[in-house]
Design a protein with these regions (language model features):
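N-terminal accessory segments
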Residues: 12-18
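A domain-level signal for the structural core that forms small-molecule/cofactor-binding pockets
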Residues: 9
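Flexible, glycine/charged-enriched surface loops at secondary-structure junctions
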Residues: 15, 35-41
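Short, Lys/Arg-enriched N-terminal segments with co-localized hydrophobic residues
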Residues: 1-3
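Cofactor-binding active-site loop characterized by glycine-rich and histidine/acidic residues
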Residues: 43-174
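N-terminal capping segment at the start of a domain
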Residues: 21-35
């Protein structure tokens, strides 16, 4: 039995099914595209699913909501990991978008592009770029809290969101 969180909540059969479907979608999308990087999307499917379904505070109906938590995929070549979770979380991406992975004009390009795909927080691709963006976002939120909402207690401000980052060894080596 797989357990998560400090309260040791067990994953449901539905959670495990969604994670397994995420893995299958990753393999299928790369096969259809004829290129891509399925490894990270398969190996981290559970982590990304848990972040979007249980850990992160976000609103797919308002992808730019100021108080949302952010997930930065520094390993931009693994964009499929992010796209699959955006489908499952209801950000307006569909399976048909996954079928267009890495195709010209698709909403699912080979690397995440800010402003192109709903739910993508920053453009990544060059190794280390997402990591530095995430640090900057976290520092900006702390600064904005102090400047724009100084009376709010810790955890009580729209600026008290989290910035999560998925990165690989290449990002750390840069």
């Amino acid at each position: 039995e797989f357990r998560m969180g400090t309260d040791s909540q067990a994953l449901t059969a539905e959670d495990l099914r969604a994670i397994n479907i995420s893995k299958a979608l990753a393999a299928d999308a790369v096969e259809k595209a004829g290129s891509g990087h399925p490894g990270t999307a398969i190996s981290l499917a559970g982590v990304a699913y848990l972040l979007y379904q249980y850990e992160m505070t976000h609103d797919p109906a308002d992808a730019r909501w100021l108080g949302r938590d952010r997930l930065i995929l520094s390993s931009g070549h693994a964009s499929l990991l992010l796209y699959i979770q955006l489908v499952l979380a209801g950000y307006g991406l569909e399976i048909s978008d996954l079928e267009q992975l890495r195709q010209w004009g698709a909403r699912t390009p080979g690397h995440p592009e800010f402003g192109h795909t709903p739910g993508v927080e920053t453009t990544t691709g060059p190794l280390g770029a997402g990591f530095t963006n995430a640090v900057g976002m976290a520092m900006a939120a702390r600064f904005e809290h102090g400047l724009l909402d100084p009376a709010a207690p810790a955890g009580g401000s729209v600026f008290d969101h989290y910035v999560y980052t998925i990165m690989g060894d290449g990002c750390l080596q840069e």
